[in-house]
């Protein structure tokens, strides 16, 4: 396997061959440059706030300031919510959160994986796979025994060890979505 010298070469090669590459060596080269961490700067906070405001803040009639406050408080301390950034070297390219509440109609289940996001410029390069593969280990380190999520994606989260529980009425649009659970004590392998 050719030694790749920079992140753009790795990303481009992976993008060109993403359907056929099975090489662990290439994936390892990508992983050396990718990290998931909570060390977030003021610039990162601004970026994450913009992502979340554009994604759901506007649609749910939240002000930018309200989303900023939510994001700021999800970066502090060891309690939930907790926000994790996906970094390509030092560039923030994605994120996810562990929260106590994500679905208003189901306060009986928690904690949640929420706000899984990859910056549009970095989609289709395999970074989402890396991000989702990190969830279980990160949750274990945070002391979480299980996680829940709801989504319209069918077949995606199963690849990362999530178990489909049932279809649920979210009272959102779309109303019917899929509820999943991840046992952080079970073995995780992406397919």
Predicted regions and their residues:
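Conserved beta-strand in the GNAT
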Residues: 83-85, 91-101, 112, 117
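Conserved active-site alpha-helix within GNAT-family acetyltransferase domains
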Residues: 141-145, 151-175
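Conserved acetyl-CoA pyrophosphate-binding loop and the N-cap/start of the following alpha-helix
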Residues: 122, 126-134
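N-terminal amphipathic/hydrophobic targeting modules at extreme N-termini
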Residues: 4-5, 10-13
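Helix-loop element at the rim of GNAT/NAT acetyltransferase active sites that forms part
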Residues: 42, 49-63
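A short beta-loop-alpha structural element at the N-terminal edge
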Residues: 33-48
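Active-site rim helix/loop that mediates acceptor-substrate recognition in acyltransferases
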Residues: 57-84
